[in-house]
Structure formats: C-alpha cells, structure tokens
A protein has these predicted regions:
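A Rossmann-like FAD-binding core segment of flavoenzymes
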Residues: 2-89, 179-212
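A short alpha-helix-loop-beta-strand transition element characteristic
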Residues: 5-10, 97-100, 153
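FAD-site-proximal beta/loop scaffold in flavoenzymes
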Residues: 77-128
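Conserved mixed alpha/beta catalytic, RNA-binding, or beta-rich assembly cores of soluble enzyme
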Residues: 98-100, 137, 152, 196, ...
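A conserved FAD-binding loop/helix module that cradles the flavin
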Residues: 121-169, 242-244
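Surface beta-strand/loop "capping" patches
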Residues: 153-191
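Exposed aromatic-hydrophobic patches
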Residues: 184, 216-228
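Short, aromatic- and glycine-rich surface loops/edge beta-strands on solvent-exposed regions
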Residues: 196-198, 226-245
Length: 245
C-alpha cells in the first residue's frame, strides 16, 4: 500500500507479540516507519456510504477491550487480516482424521493420512511459510503415493510436549526410507533460549539448540530415523527444554 502511494497509519495486533514473520515486520513495517501497536484491536467503524474512521482500543490478556483506552483514528480504508487455515473439505468428506493443532490431516513421514492411500501436502496439510516447503511436500507425497501401491506398512506414532504448537509428521512408517525425514514445527508460544529434544523409548538420541522460537515462524529440520533405531512400538517423543534464567 505504501509503495502505491497510500499512507498507512498503523498495524494493530491483538496479541502481545507479533503474529507476522520477523523479516516481514522489518521489511514491511520498520523500513517504512509504519507503527505496530501490540495488544490493540479495532472495536468500531465509522461512516455511512464509505469508511471515515475506526475506533481502536487496548485489549487485556483475554483479548477483551479495556474500557477507557479507546481512541478514534480518521481513515478511509481498513484491512482486516484473519490468518490462514488449511482447506480440507475434500479430506473431511472422505473421513480423513484432522489434527486439531494444524487443522490439516494427521500424516506419517511420507505424508500419507490415516486412511491408506490418501496423501496430503502443501497448505492443505499445514500452513507453510515458504512456497519451497509446499513444493517439496508435493514431490514427497507424489513419490510416496507411487511407493504405497506395492508395500505394507509398520507405523509408530510421533508425540510432542505441550510447548509445541504442532509438529508434522505425526507418524513414521518403518517400512519406508526414513534416512532423511523432514519435520516442520511451531512453538506454542514465544520462547527464549531453548533446546528441542528427541527421545526414543525414554532415551535422548538427538537435540538442537535455538536462540528463540516464535509461533509465526515455522521451523524445519531433517533427521535420519533409520540410524536412530526405531523399533516396533517405539515411543518417539519430542519436547522443548527452556533454558533456566
């Protein structure tokens, strides 16, 4: 909008932390001196034939407007951003179980859903930050569908701690090549220095340190589960350990 000549008066985010990617905040807001107001929301709009202004107010920890903080801003346009959720009408019509966190199908490392022969990929599986991830998952789903026709399956579940917003895939098929399984995850909240830990049957087998984790920024990692030694009915579990102050 700024590049097209509009004057953007501000961005109002109801959450106490930004929902956008860090790079987008810097490139789209900071670089153009557009203010970001956290813990604020639009509570009223003004105008008859067209918009003449809006009312904004601070919100509390429960996203409820705080009385007495209202202010009117004169403007002629309001853009409301409500985020994204995967579109899965087709999957639901086929009875494919969905993950309550991703809003997409529960899948294994080859992106097959819990209904044999049905695969999911891209933003139908979970909302991706980059189109590169969408393309990669589409290629994997295609290869996996071709492999599925001639093989049986032996699956184990992948579980996560409450510090995760979600992690994909949710299952691993031991009959497949699991030497380079790509996993995607988001934290449930903003975290400082922390460690993502993988345990198999209660023993730590892998970990990675992160300076911080933010829910808007999806993380990607690739692991060799073949070398990590997943047995029949293994307990495969990821958790996040936050560094103590």
């Amino acid at each position: 909008l700024t590049l097209e000549g509009a004057e953007v008066l501000g961005v109002y985010e109801a959450k106490p932390t930004p929902s956008g990617l860090t790079r987008n905040i810097h490139q789209c807001l900071h670089d153009y001196d557009i203010p970001l107001h956290l813990s604020h929301t639009v509570t009223r709009v003004f105008g008859a034939d067209r918009l003449t202004g809006v009312e904004v107010a601070e919100v509390d920890a429960h996203m409820r407007p705080i009385t007495g903080t209202e202010q009117r801003i004169d403007c002629d346009a309001l853009i409301v951003s409500v985020g994204l959720i995967p579109e899965n009408e087709l999957a639901e019509s086929l009875g494919v179980p969905l993950d309550g966190h991703t809003r997409g199908p529960v899948c294994d490392g080859q992106l097959m859903t819990e209904i044999p022969g049905i695969f999911s990929c891209g933003n139908a599986l979970h909302v991706n930050d980059l189109v590169d991830y969408v393309s990669a998952s589409g290629e994997l789903a295609g290869r996996s569908a071709a492999h599925f026709a001639a093989h049986t399956r032996d699956e184990v579940a992948v579980t996560i701690s409450n510090d995760f917003g979600y992690l994909v895939p949710q299952r691993l098929d031991r009959t497949q090549d699991n030497s380079a399984v790509t996993l995607y995850f988001r934290s449930a909240e903003v975290l400082g220095p922390c460690r993502v830990v993988l345990t198999i049957d209660g023993s730590e087998v892998w970990s990675r340190r992160y300076p911080f984790l933010r829910p808007p920024e999806m993380q990607q990692l690739t692991l060799d589960f073949d070398k990590l030694g997943i047995a029949d009915a293994s307990d495969v579990h990821f958790e996040i350990e936050v560094a103590k102050a």
